[in-house]
A protein has these predicted regions:
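TRNA-recognition modules of translation machinery and tRNA-sensing kinases, especially anticodon-binding
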Residues: 1-152
């Protein structure tokens, strides 16, 4: 018995990036990364999956509608990250021996389960630069300067 043909398609709110889009996109990411590193920021990678309680901490009940949430094979309540900052907060709490100030950048996909619309996808890249453990307005100024340098 022959199996039914599966229609090749992408889920609503998601998209493929073919080479003609990926090549300039990758160049842009490389340019941004170079600016971040020139300012002394280090790359950070975190898992796409986090315990749901970590991701619910920032917005609580409001975050529920953002989460792609499920129970994994081990029975744990997990979700795809919808924001990179929450993973940074977990890293800062989990690893007490990070340098102070901890200057990190992260460019990675995030997922939001909210309704997709024109220009609003369920999977997209987020680009973050943060300084953890620095007091005062100079850290804020430095982040603004980095943003300015990326845009110019």
């Amino acid at each position: 018995m022959a199996s039914a043909l599966i229609e090749p398609r992408v889920l609503r709110g998601f998209r493929d990036y073919l080479p003609e889009e990926m090549i300039p996109r990758q160049r842009m990411i490389n340019t941004i990364t170079a600016v971040f590193e020139r300012h002394g920021f280090a790359p950070l990678g975190t898992p796409a999956l986090e315990y749901s309680e970590v991701l619910l901490g920032k917005y609580g009940a409001d975050a529920e509608k953002l989460l792609f949430r499920f129970t994994d094979n081990g029975g744990r309540d997990v979700s795809l990250r919808y924001d990179l900052t929450l993973s940074l907060a977990r890293v800062a709490a989990q690893y007490g021996n990070l340098p102070v100030p901890f200057k990190r950048y992260q460019i990675a996909p995030v997922w939001r389960a909210e309704r997709p619309g024109h220009g609003r996808f369920r999977e997209f890249y987020q680009c973050d630069v943060d300084i953890v453990g620095a007091a005062g307005p100079l850290a804020e100024y430095e982040c603004i300067q980095v943003d300015y340098d990326v845009m110019t």
